[in-house]
């Protein structure tokens, strides 16, 4: 996520003071582009986890120090390239940067040197150890010490020594000049009677990885990334539910007014936290999922007073929250290759007839579920949250003693239907007069609550898991609502975790279909539609037997229901799934009067909220691919007066925790609350609608063909090529997945092509072939490279050249007037049109050379040309040699700790990617594959970094399975191999014939 911040830059010219005021400096964008030096920053070499914990214990943050106590936070502009190096050599004693409480962050005998690149560049990690700097003789399995590895072995150490010698010389040469310059400027300032500090201001943008994604290590700690722990005390004067997540506090607000002060833009939860954390510097914090978790013992004691709780809590009346119901969905696949599956949307009292002899892969799309061993929700239980999980027959304890038994599934129950706040009550039995504690979020260590060992537990709302070990380890006990009082000993409840629903999702955005039922629970007469309905009474008027809407089933797409006709009034989002009665659409005060479907890029979402009614002015916040449950807690405020949706579809809520009235926000600008359908400026929470990857055995291409126009008549699904359509004549199409090539012939007797991209084609005219007979349908393979094409004025790709990377609606216009005679398609897929403005006959162009365009196409020349719009899809990248997947490891909240390696299939977001603009972007961290330091040398490691679009982040996949870097065609993705700890890490290497570790397969999700 990119969060711009305005900093007040002050250059300290007083060289007589020996106290160092800053350890970091940032360079302006102009100097970033031209600077050949980097910032040197010392940091502990080993045990990075110890470093992060020490950083958390300190009362100040390295990146966000307390501005009141550190006036010299230097976002300084270096006067020259050498001045920047000199400045950091001069401030080598990192332990003096902050007070004594913070010095432990930096004190280390063994130190590691990092290169911190300017904001648009990726980091270079240079280790003093020989294992890191000198490339292993086993760069990848089977190399066995190739000559190219040995030649580059000494490069890092030589570069490091060269930089060190240069910095020492610069220090000697410029030390005297720097002091003299400082004294002169100080004398001028004193003479003028003004402050000797020179104030500068610059707009700096920090690129922060998305901190909301918890990282799960490779062990069996399924909930190791859960970091949400808050409680509420039952004192009548206060309600201590704290709304926001700590990860959301990593957002910063920004002031577009360049004359505002630094502290005015930092008066948020961060500033308050830094102020209050000083009083607790002696206590140790806990880190979960890379996000700071304050010691629960500080403010979760029953004896604490309301005044002491006030910095950490917020008065909220849970009863006033109006929860929005949501549908559930779970898909059960056969474990070993069979295409058999079962889709579950509601409770299944008896599932014993379902056959999964080898086990099942269960994908929970939405909601939380409980599997039972026996019918009617009896027997052993298994809790499932959103995500994938493999279950074999051993999920039942008794089956482990009887290997001959098959996989058993008795019944299924859905336990969460909205985003309501979970509440569990802990009441000490030894002290009846003591106030009970109400917990709302995960507690990794219940012992830190300092509650008696003998405690009674009551679940007020939601479903909770009680673990016998801290940090959510061991066999959990399921605690459900309305099941009375639980008597649990301290040994059985060391940590607590509530089940919670995930974000808004859509699986098949183009598969638009809704079925209306006359009665609740999907009974009575039905009506279905797949287009906008601006008036439900008019739509139902033709069916006299249909008397109102009792229940709704959304087959595909994401829809909005409106309280009034013509898409006005209150709004309610309809996700894919079942809405069994009117309470499922309880957000609307009246019946549904109109429906509308939503279309957008659901992979990348970006929005800006403004506190001013004038766009691009005042305080605002940028949000990318992240949901925020409490905008007030991050310091933005409760009122939003204008909105700019840059991409995706967002849902804003009138209340916190995604409760209350909903406002659907599509791409565009909203200048006041009337524009988004609100009754006031109040918006307290917001979240995007995101594309959900499909499960295993789902088709990568899907097209629905209809025998009549307007999606009427007989319907046939196509998932692969059909070479003969003589027995079925399609008249309209729904292209749901992938792109397709339609082959047809007209009266001239020649075959022609027509490309169908993802979308809806109500008739053949919308396809581009109004009077034609369709003969064949062919899916078009996905490509993972940026499009590039060259048109030539002479045959055989000679003469004047017109190079294109984007669409041109007229090649023959007065500006270009290019008469194409030959074509060289360098990369990507292109569509050539005979006429201008993408009209007329079409031809799909794949990478090759066409020496004579007229002989190839039968056209005189090209009228217009554009790249084919490949649909946005999620993918997994599998290494052929190791049969393992490209995986993100480390903490997504800290780019320095993240690395890229290969590991076995896990089903987690850390193995899911998507390709756009030449970038492979991780779904877990929203960062890109990046060659560390941009070194175009074999053996350079590949890491993750925020998108900056430079060549080191761009990749293309060739047809032979190699993934090459835009830095050089002679650099391809490889696995390092060898016997060291980093043997599974990914590097770039020279392409070698027959080297299977350099071959990758793309799995479309």
Curated annotation (Swiss-Prot):
Residues 132-159, 173-198 are annotated as: Disordered. GO terms for molecular function: carbohydrate binding. The modification Phosphoserine is found at residues 122, 129-130, 136, 140. Residues 367-416, 462-500, 512-556, 557-599, 605-647, 648-690, 701-737, 738-781, 828-869 form the Beta/gamma crystallin 'Greek key' domain. Residues 871-1003 form the Ricin B-type lectin domain. It comes from the Eukaryota. Keywords: Lectin, Phosphoprotein, Repeat. This is Beta/gamma crystallin domain-containing protein 3. It comes from Mus musculus (Mouse).
């Amino acid at each position: 996520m990119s969060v711009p911040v305005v900093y007040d830059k002050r250059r300290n010219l007083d060289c007589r003071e020996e106290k160092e005021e800053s350890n970091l400096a940032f360079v302006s964008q102009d100097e970033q582009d031209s600077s050949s030096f980097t910032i040197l920053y010392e940091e502990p070499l080993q045990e990075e986890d110890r470093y992060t914990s020490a950083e958390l214990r300190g009362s100040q943050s390295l990146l966000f120090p307390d501005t009141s106590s550190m006036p010299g936070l230097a976002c300084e502009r270096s006067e020259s390239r050498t001045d920047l190096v000199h400045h950091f050599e001069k401030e080598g004693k990192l332990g003096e940067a902050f007070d004594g409480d913070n010095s432990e962050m930096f004190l280390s005998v063994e130190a590691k040197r990092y290169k911190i690149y300017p904001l648009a560049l990726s980091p270079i990690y240079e280790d003093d150890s020989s294992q890191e700097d000198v490339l292993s003789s086993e760069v990848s399995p089977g190399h066995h010490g190739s000559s190219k590895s040995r030649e580059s072995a000494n490069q890092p150490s030589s570069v490091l020594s060269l930089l060190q010698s240069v910095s020492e010389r610069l220090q000697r040469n410029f030390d005297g000049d720097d002091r003299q310059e400082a004294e002169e400027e100080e004398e001028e300032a004193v003479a003028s009677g003004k402050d000797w500090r020179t104030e500068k201001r610059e707009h700096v943008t920090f690129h922060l990885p998305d901190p909301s994604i918890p990282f799960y290590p490779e062990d069996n700690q399924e909930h190791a990334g859960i970091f949400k722990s808050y409680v509420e005390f039952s004192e009548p004067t206060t309600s201590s539910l704290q709304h926001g997540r700590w990860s959301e506090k990593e957002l910063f607000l920004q002031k577009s007014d360049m004359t505002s002060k630094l502290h005015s833009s930092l008066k948020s939860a961060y500033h308050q936290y830094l102020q209050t954390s000083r009083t607790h510097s002696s206590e140790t914090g806990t880190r979960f999922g890379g996000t700071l978790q304050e010691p629960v013992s500080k403010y979760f004691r029953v004896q604490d007073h309301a005044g002491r709780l006030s910095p950490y809590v917020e008065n909220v009346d849970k009863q006033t929250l109006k929860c929005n119901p949501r549908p559930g969905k779970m898909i059960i696949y056969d474990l070993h290759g069979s295409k058999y599956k079962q889709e579950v949307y509601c409770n299944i009292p008896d599932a014993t007839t379902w056959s999964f002899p080898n086990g099942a892969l269960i994908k929970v799309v939405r909601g939380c579920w409980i599997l039972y061993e026996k019918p009617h929700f009896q027997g052993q239980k298994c809790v499932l949250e959103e995500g994938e999980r493999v279950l074999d027959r051993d999920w039942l304890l008794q089956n482990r003693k009887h290997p001959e038994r098959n996989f058993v599934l008795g019944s299924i129950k859905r336990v969460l239907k909205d985003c309501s706040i979970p509440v569990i009550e802990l009441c000490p039995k030894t002290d009846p007069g003591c106030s009970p504690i109400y917990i709302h979020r995960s507690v990794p260590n219940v012992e830190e609550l300092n509650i008696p060992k003998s405690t009674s537990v009551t679940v007020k709302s939601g479903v909770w898991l009680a673990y016998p070990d801290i940090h959510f380890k061991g066999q959990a006990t399921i605690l459900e609502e309305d099941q009375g009082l639980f008597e649990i000993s301290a040994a059985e409840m060391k940590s607590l975790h509530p089940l919670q629903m995930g974000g808004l999702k859509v699986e098949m955005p183009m598969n638009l279909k809704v079925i209306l039922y006359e009665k609740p629970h999907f009974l009575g007469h039905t009506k279905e539609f797949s287009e906008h309905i601006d008036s439900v009474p008019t739509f139902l008027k033709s069916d006299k037997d249909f008397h109102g809407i009792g229940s709704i089933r959304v087959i595909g797409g994401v829809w909005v229901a409106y309280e009034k006709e013509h898409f006005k009034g209150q709004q309610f989002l309809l996700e894919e799934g079942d809405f069994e009665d009117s309470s499922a659409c309880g957000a609307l005060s009246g019946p549904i009067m109109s429906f509308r479907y939503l279309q957008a890029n659901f992979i990348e979402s970006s929005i800006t909220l403004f506190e001013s009614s004038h766009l691009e002015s005042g305080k605002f916040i940028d949000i990318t691919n992240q949901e925020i449950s409490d905008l007030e807690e991050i310091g933005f405020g409760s009122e939003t007066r204008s909105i700019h949706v840059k991409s995706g579809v967002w849902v804003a809520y009138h209340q916190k925790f995604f409760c209350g009235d909903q406002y659907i926000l599509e791409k565009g600008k909203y200048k006041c609350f009337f524009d988004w359908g609100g009754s006031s400026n109040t918006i307290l929470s917001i979240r995007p609608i995101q594309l959900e990857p499909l499960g295993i055995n789902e088709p990568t291409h899907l097209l629905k063909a209809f025998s009549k126009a307007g999606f009427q008549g007989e319907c046939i699904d196509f998932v692969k090529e059909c070479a003969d359509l003589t027995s079925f004549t399609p008249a309209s199409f729904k292209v749901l997945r992938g792109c397709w090539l339609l082959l047809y012939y007209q009266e001239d007797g020649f075959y022609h092509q027509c490309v169908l991209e993802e979308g809806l084609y109500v008739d053949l005219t919308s396809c581009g072939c109004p009077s034609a007979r369709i003969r064949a349908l062919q899916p078009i393979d996905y490509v993972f490279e940026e499009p590039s094409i060259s048109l030539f004025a002479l045959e055989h790709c000679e003469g004047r050249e017109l190079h294109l990377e984007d669409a041109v609606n007229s090649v023959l216009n007065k500006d270009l007037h290019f008469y194409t005679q030959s074509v060289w398609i360098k990369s990507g897929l292109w569509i050539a049109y005979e006429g201008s403005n993408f009209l007329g006959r079409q031809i799909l162009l794949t990478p090759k050379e066409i020496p004579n365009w007229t002989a190839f196409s039968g056209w005189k020349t090209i009228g217009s040309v554009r790249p084919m719009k490949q649909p946005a899809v999620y993918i997994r990248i599998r290494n052929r040699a190791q049969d393992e997947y490209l995986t993100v490891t480390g903490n997504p909240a800290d780019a320095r700790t993240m690395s890229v390696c290969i590991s076995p299939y896990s089903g987690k977001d850390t193995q899911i990617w998507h390709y756009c603009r030449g970038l492979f972007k991780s779904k877990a961290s929203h960062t890109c594959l990046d060659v560390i330091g941009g070194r175009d040398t074999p053996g350079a490691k590949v890491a993750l970094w925020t998108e900056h679009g430079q060549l080191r982040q761009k990749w293309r996949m060739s047809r032979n399975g190699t993934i090459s870097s835009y830095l050089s065609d002679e650099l391809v993705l490889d696995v390092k191999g060898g016997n060291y700890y980093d043997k599974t890490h990914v590097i770039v290497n020279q392409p070698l014939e027959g080297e299977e570790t350099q071959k990758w397969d793309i799995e479309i999700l």
